[in-house]
């Protein structure tokens, strides 16, 4: 039960952070490309790399911190469902190039961000 509490707490915080990130990005960037979800997901990948890399080095850290940060916070912050829905909308509106770029950049940069986070965390 304690594990579920920490996941829920992190997930709630991550969801609020995603909402705030979306508000800020949409305030300054208005275009067909879904920048808010894109930036959120790439930032979430960097965070999960940082958290996982850091926690991997720490033996005395509570396992609940891992549930809070990785499963909860990062899980609540990033959003694969919005990514999928936005790509379907782009394809349905015949914006195939933008959908292709969004998918390709999200996967490539997401992997690079996670890897970068792991490297940074291991150097700390």
Swiss-Prot record:
Localization in the cell: Cell inner membrane
Q: According to the entry, what is the taxonomic lineage of the organism?
A: Bacteria, Pseudomonadati, Bacteroidota, Flavobacteriia, Flavobacteriales
Query: Would the keyword Cell membrane turn up in this protein's UniProt record?
Result: yes
Arranged from A to Z, the UniProt key words for this protein are:
Cell inner membrane, Cell membrane, Ion channel, Ion transport, Membrane, Metal-binding, Sodium, Transmembrane, Transmembrane helix, Transport
Write one Pfam family the protein is assigned to.
CRCB
The protein depicted here goes by the name Fluoride-specific ion channel FluC
Q: Give the protein's biological function.
A: Fluoride-specific ion channel. Important for reducing fluoride concentration in the cell, thus reducing its toxicity.
Q: Which GO terms describe its biological process?
A: cellular detoxification of fluoride
Which reaction is the catalytic activity of this chain?
fluoride(in) = fluoride(out)
Q: Which GO terms describe its molecular function?
A: fluoride channel activity; metal ion binding
**Taxonomic source organism:** Flavobacterium psychrophilum (strain ATCC 49511 / DSM 21280 / CIP 103535 / JIP02/86)
The text of the family note is: Belongs to the fluoride channel Fluc/FEX (TC 1.A.43) family.
Q: What cellular component terms from Gene Ontology apply here?
A: plasma membrane
Main location (coarse class): membrane
Please list every transmembrane segment annotated in the UniProt record, as residue ranges: 4-24, 35-55, 63-83, 96-116
Q: How does it sit in the membrane?
A: Multi-pass membrane protein
- Anything known on activity regulation? Na(+) is not transported, but it plays an essential structural role and its presence is essential for fluoride channel function.
User: In which residues is Na(+) bound?
Assistant: 75, 78
Glycosyltransferase in keyword set: no
**Which InterPro entries does the entry link to?**
FluC
| UniProt cross-references to HAMAP family, sorted A to Z | FluC (MF_00454)
The domain of life is: Bacteria
